[in-house]
């Protein structure tokens, strides 16, 4: 059967089985294992484990997925379900360590090295499953996904998330690192299971047949599963937005915990288990005098499973080769050339049909002035950005966070880069910031994610700007994720302290302090104060969120330790999982500071009470709170009106000309808002296309809705990032809106991938009503039509527009666009693109 004839049937079969879910998927686990290996530094005694794992990728990758091998009913009718279950827990690891130490003393031969690599893969799977499935933990990935997107139903989130993670992985990531053959140490597994159970519980044929099914399932995922992206994106915006970054059980967090368990496994292999505490939950293992974070509790995964049909088996030659102790499975190519050719041809034709081939509008800007990148993968360069004149030379400088930055032995410690501007603006050449940034600050806590948020203010009121940096995952090694904010004092010579002068911490577990930061005058003394948003903080419940402010003042001294519980001003969210503080914005209205706080997953549950069934509540309506501090009561609220819209995800303000009248306006983004598109006489729902509302701001009334903007593609997250700034020196602010997940083709991922766009609207050409709905073309909405510029992503699938900022020099005001998933310098490391608009 050819690959092309297989594809439609496979896609239908996978789609029909998706609602049943599956174990946390093959692709997801393989990606976690790949990332965990990237910065592993593990050379104990006579073994360099990183080199061993790199040499034996065939065994390592097979081991990563193996624990789920016997779950599906296609594997001998599911009779060995319990064997898979036992492979997820510490007793299996303990039995494996003792088996290897008793039978294969160092130095190891190649087959034993493969066994060790296979075991390391299994331990990655063990660690990842605990936080992904919330096994013995609160607020792991799937449990939070259930609370946000499935009315609190863990089982529904489990069903969608396990297989949806694979769909997302295949849609977003390049799996060109996947080994074309896998090795399973069958004879050794028989010995390990006999040691674990004290009797024979499984046969060689069962291990070979069921692990071969896994291998074929991986082939199926590589072939077609990414085409289900629209289905799973519709089901769960949380899955799409938080898959990599979520603090407990996101991809990066699971990779971090994989590296931790690798260190423990190597310790046990070389020293035995006598100096280890081995609770059943593998995330709580401790060796060598380390303290357990908590014993945790073992909970059965109780997975959903999909049954793959034998049609897949018929499509791939049964390439199985036995060795003395194991078996190899092989495939000539993971993605047949015929399929790649077909996809590319279809993509070209559809782009030509709907976009007009390669012709670009004159308003399109496809080439940046310069691009800045990093040479280390997964850094998330540009996750946070701010601009200020740090060295006090009269030119704006760029401050950029890379919270995912890692180097060997130091995972996700994070970095902050300072790039100084001059008469020409920012450096007009491409830069590797690790080599050419003017200043670098580096985090020092394991997986602390230093650089997740930034703010510049004169905190100690000495006339020199200081820098505040958020590190919301500090405490991840203890599973507390309390977070921290570090303040670096500036000097009159234009420099900055090399270590933090002030540390602000939080006592609550899962506080994630420092997720958002803002400089705004809270106490009315005309000096900006430090405002901290923690949307995942308990706030008296679960992820209600808090916003706290510390007043600036000369009494703040060097090396001071502050607790957020003692903040000068604090407000809290209304509901569990409402993420109050997800976005922050400050604006001066009639000489008073208006502080705006976004709570995008607010759902008005408190109003519903027990009058309505939980299924009747509207998920993630979103709400924005407006405060005139120091008053802690909100002056107004703006609430979303459509489920899953997430109003308040982004906020910005400025001055525009509205029908000839100068207006101070507030922009509020609802990036997952469902809008309606009209193509001639056909009406289509644009799921998660995104929308932005523009309000008039006054100090004595509720903001008045003036205009709306809408995206033109499903899932594009139009309005997910907003900014207003005067780009042409006419005294009016241009409106800048990003759609970082926009997909060029109208099939929303069936053919092409993300290309991201940023729209710039001139500040003197705004009108009342629907700005993007009155179109000359036969397709509405038309966000490009009224835009002055449309910035086109220079790189596909890079999340172009994931954040943006403007940097002003004496001569120009430049736009800096982050592409958080760019692979310009290294895989998914992120990049910054600099544009000079309106300054010719």
From Swiss-Prot:
InterPro entries named among the record's database cross-references: FG-GAP, Gprt_PLipase_D, Int_alpha_beta-p, Integrin_alpha_N, PLPC/GPLD1
Glycosylation site list: 94, 271, 292, 307, 321, 501, 568, 591, 604, 659
Signal peptide (residue range): 1-23
GO cellular component: cytoplasm; extracellular exosome; extracellular matrix; extracellular region; extracellular space; intracellular membrane-bounded organelle; lysosomal membrane
Role played: This protein hydrolyzes the inositol phosphate linkage in proteins anchored by phosphatidylinositol glycans (GPI-anchor) thus releasing these proteins from the membrane.
Subunit structure: Monomer.
Protein name: Phosphatidylinositol-glycan-specific phospholipase D
Name of the gene this protein is made from: GPLD1
């Amino acid at each position: 059967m050819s690959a092309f004839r297989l594809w439609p049937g496979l896609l239908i079969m996978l789609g029909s089985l998706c609602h049943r879910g599956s174990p946390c998927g093959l692709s997801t686990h393989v990606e976690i294992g790949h990332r965990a290996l990237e910065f592993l530094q593990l050379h104990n005694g006579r073994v360099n484990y990183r080199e061993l794992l790199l040499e034996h990728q065939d065994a390592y990758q097979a081991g990563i997925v193996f624990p789920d091998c016997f779950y599906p009913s296609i594997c001998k009718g599911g009779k060995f379900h319990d064997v898979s279950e036992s492979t997820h827990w510490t007793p299996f690891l303990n039995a494996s360590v003792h088996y290897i130490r008793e039978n294969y003393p160092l130095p190891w031969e190649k087959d034993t090295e493969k066994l060790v690599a296979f075991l390391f893969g299994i331990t990655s799977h063990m660690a990842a499953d605990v936080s992904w499935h919330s096994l013995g933990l609160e607020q792991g990935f799937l449990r939070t996904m259930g609370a946000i997107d499935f009315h609190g139903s863990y089982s529904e989130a489990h069903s969608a998330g396990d297989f949806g993670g694979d769909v997302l992985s295949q849609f977003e990531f390049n799996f060109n690192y996947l080994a074309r053959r896998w090795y399973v140490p069958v004879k050794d597994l028989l010995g390990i299971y006999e040691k674990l159970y004290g009797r024979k519980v499984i046969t060689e044929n069962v291990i070979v047949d069921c692990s071969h099914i896994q291998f074929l399932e991986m082939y199926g995922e590589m072939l077609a599963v990414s085409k289900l992206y629209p289905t799973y994106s519709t089901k769960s915006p949380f899955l799409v937005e938080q898959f990599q970054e979520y603090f407990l059980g996101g991809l990066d967090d699971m990779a971090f915990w994989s590296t931790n368990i690798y260190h423990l496994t190597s310790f046990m292999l070389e020293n035995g288990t006598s100096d280890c505490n081995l609770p059943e939950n593998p995330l709580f293992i401790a060796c060598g005098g380390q303290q357990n974070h908590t014993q945790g509790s073992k909970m059965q995964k109780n997975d959903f499973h999909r049954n793959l049909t034998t049609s897949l088996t018929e499509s791939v030659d049964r390439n199985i080769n036995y060795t003395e102790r194991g078996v190899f499975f092989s495939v000539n190519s993971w993605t047949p050339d015929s399929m790649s050719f077909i996809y590319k041809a279809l993509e070209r034709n559809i782009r030509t049909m709907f976009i007009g081939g390669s012709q670009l509008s004159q308003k399109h800007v496809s080439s940046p002035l310069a691009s800045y990148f990093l040479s280390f993968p997964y850094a998330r360069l540009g996750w946070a950005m701010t601009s200020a004149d740090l060295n006090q030379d009269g030119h704006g400088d760029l401050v950029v966070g890379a919270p995912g930055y890692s180097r060997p032995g130091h995972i996700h410690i994070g970095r902050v880069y300072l790039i100084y501007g001059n008469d020409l603006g920012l450096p007009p050449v491409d830069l590797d910031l690790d080599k050419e940034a003017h200043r670098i600050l580096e985090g020092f806590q394991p997986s602390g994610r230093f650089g997740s948020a930034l703010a510049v203010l004169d905190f100690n009121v000495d006339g020199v700007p200081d820098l505040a940096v958020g590190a919301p995952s500090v405490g991840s090694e203890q599973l507390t994720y309390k977070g921290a904010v570090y303040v670096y004092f500036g000097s009159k010579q234009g420099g900055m302290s090399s270590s933090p002068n002030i540390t602000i911490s939080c006592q609550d577990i899962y506080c994630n302090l420092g997720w958002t930061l803002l400089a705004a005058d809270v106490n009315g003394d005309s000096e900006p104060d430090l405002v901290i948003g923690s949307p995942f903080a308990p706030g008296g419940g679960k992820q209600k969120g808090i916003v706290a402010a510390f007043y600036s003042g000369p009494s703040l001294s060097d090396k001071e330790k502050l607790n957020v519980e003692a903040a000068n001003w604090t407000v809290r969210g209304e509901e569990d999982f409402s993420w109050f503080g997800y976005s922050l914005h400050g604006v001066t209205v009639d000489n008073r500071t208006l502080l705006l706080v976004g709570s995008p997953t607010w759902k008005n549950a408190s109003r519903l009470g027990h009058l309505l069934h939980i299924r009747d509540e509207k998920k993630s309506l979103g709400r924005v709170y407006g405060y005139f501090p120091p008053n802690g009561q909100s002056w107004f609220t703006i609430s979303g009106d459509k489920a899953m819209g997430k109003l308040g995800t982004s906020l910005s303000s400025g001055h525009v000309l509205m029908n000839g009248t100068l207006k101070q306006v507030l922009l509020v983004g609802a990036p997952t808002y469902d809008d309606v598109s009209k193509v001639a006489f056909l009406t289509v729902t644009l799921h998660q296309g995104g929308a932005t509302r523009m309000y008039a701001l006054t100090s004595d009334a509720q903001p008045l809705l003036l205009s709306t903007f809408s995206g033109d593609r499903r899932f594009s997250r139009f309005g997910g990032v907003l900014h207003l700034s005067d780009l042409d020196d006419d005294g009016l602010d241009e409106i800048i809106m990003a759609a970082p997940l926009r997909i060029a083709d109208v099939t929303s991922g069936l053919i092409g991938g993300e290309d991201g766009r940023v729209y710039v609207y001139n500040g003197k050409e705004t009108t009342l009503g629907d700005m993007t709905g009155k179109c000359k073309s036969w397709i509405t909405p038309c966000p490009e039509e009224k835009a002055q510029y449309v910035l086109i992503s220079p790189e596909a699938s890079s999340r172009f527009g994931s954040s943006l900022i403007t940097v002003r020099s004496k001569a120009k005001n430049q736009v800096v666009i982050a592409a958080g998933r760019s692979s310009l310098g290294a895989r998914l490391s992120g990049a910054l693109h600099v544009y000079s608009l309106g300054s010719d």
